[in-house]
Amino acid sequence: MALFEIIISLFVVYIIHNAISKYKKIHVNELCGPTPIPILGNLHQFGELPHRVLTKMTKKYGHILRVYMADMYTVVVSDPLLIREMYVDNSDIFTDRVKKPSVEHGTFYHGTVTSYGEHWKNNREIVGKAMRKTNLKHIYELLDKQVDVLIRSMKSIETSGKTFDTRYYITKFTMSAMFKFLFNHDIPEDEDINKGDTQKLMGPMSEVFQNAGRGSLFDVINITQPLYLLYLEMFDQSFKDIMKYHREKYNEHLKTFDPDVERDLLDILIKEYGTDNDDKILSILATINDFFLAGVDTSSTALESMVLMLTNYPEIQEKAFDEIKTVVNGRSKVNLSDRQSTPYLVAVIKETLRYKPMSPFGLPRSSSKDCMIGGHFIPKNAQILINYQALGMNEEYYENPEQFDPSRFLKVESNVAFLPFSIGIRSCVGQSFAQDELYICISNILLNFKLKSIDGKKIDETEEYGLTLKTKNRFNVTLEKRII
């Protein structure tokens, strides 16, 4: 009985201490936000679509606000000028990633995405150099080949009278492009990505995305973090399987590695990092993992959204097709060199990324010290999130933001609020590759097919919350061959 009373007393003391830490005033210019509760903070208010709840909160608290994700003081920002002030003007303060068990377990803070401090600076320099050394002609040929495979599959589906499983084939396209870019590996055209060799990687990667999308309360409660890390190390197999797969590819490359012949990004990383200690090898493996986790699902989400919006807005689809048809002038394929001649299609891509962001918040950053941003106090170790939904719906920068209207991007050369790949020195390192991938894929789909919903009605655009914002319900579309 005495032990039970002690436990209850300690719990009560913890609750009181936790509440005081959240309620106390930290600065005269501290951020406003909803009232938190002990332990949970504001998590109980987020619902199924936290990014939309936080977007609604901007009406009351403005485009920079404070919430508590359990014990984690979090700054949510959707004002592009404040984002620039943080990530560009004060990049030395807002470069680091957030430290928590799920990140440490999966990456050991190596690679380019989750590392921080001097380790990140070194990785960024090496990976940046590796990306610059990547042969552009090789990338163009790589993407062209993968588009050819996709279009052949779509033609076969159209001829058979079946419907097009958007998520499956788009994911296979982005995954095949990444396999070729990283490993110089061709996924067989008839291979089911849910089976065979690719499933060894895609299976555990799907689990990682599902788990990360759901999140864990223990990841953001200070007192439980050490135990949660131990739990992950003991029982979570997904990241171990992923790293095992990457190590197998790494070992295969070492057997045939020639420093004078750079076959893919892995070869370049081996050459740039070296292989003389375990830390360098881990950085190589973590970087490869970064490209897969950050590149495959985000690009497939964006392309799936483009198919969705073009199907739901046939008049926009026809206008984009007419532009493409005029530019190719009888050719059977759109090339990357056609991009400058297709401003409306580029506007469609941009509008889709604004209207249907790839990710709710991108990758969180952390403040390395107390600072003032836009007259607001940001404490040390605050988690920083960009709310891309609220950013894209910010009425100060977008007229009638609830409307899907690509022409808004034709009226001005650029919009300071358009930041789908973030901004500053820690923006997406694969941005150029992703932009090429999105353009070459959707342009050739439009050139070859008219996209229609199966029942003639609009497809449900509701998204499902996760690391990326895919549609809640998978959808197929009907393909109608274009006459060009």
Swiss-Prot record:
Its EC number is 1.14.-.-. InterPro entries: Cyt_P450 (IPR001128), Cyt_P450_CS (IPR017972), Cyt_P450_E_grp-I (IPR002401), Cyt_P450_sf (IPR036396). It is found in: Membrane. The chain crosses the membrane at residues 1-21. Its cofactor is heme. It comes from the Eukaryota. PROSITE patterns: CYTOCHROME_P450. It is a single-pass membrane protein. Pfam families: p450. GO terms for cellular component: membrane. Heme binds at C428. Keywords: Heme, Iron, Membrane, Metal-binding, Monooxygenase, Oxidoreductase, Transmembrane, Transmembrane helix. One of its GO terms (molecular function) is monooxygenase activity. Belongs to the cytochrome P450 family. This is Probable cytochrome P450 508A1. It comes from Dictyostelium discoideum. The lineage of its organism: Eukaryota, Amoebozoa, Evosea, Eumycetozoa, Dictyostelia.
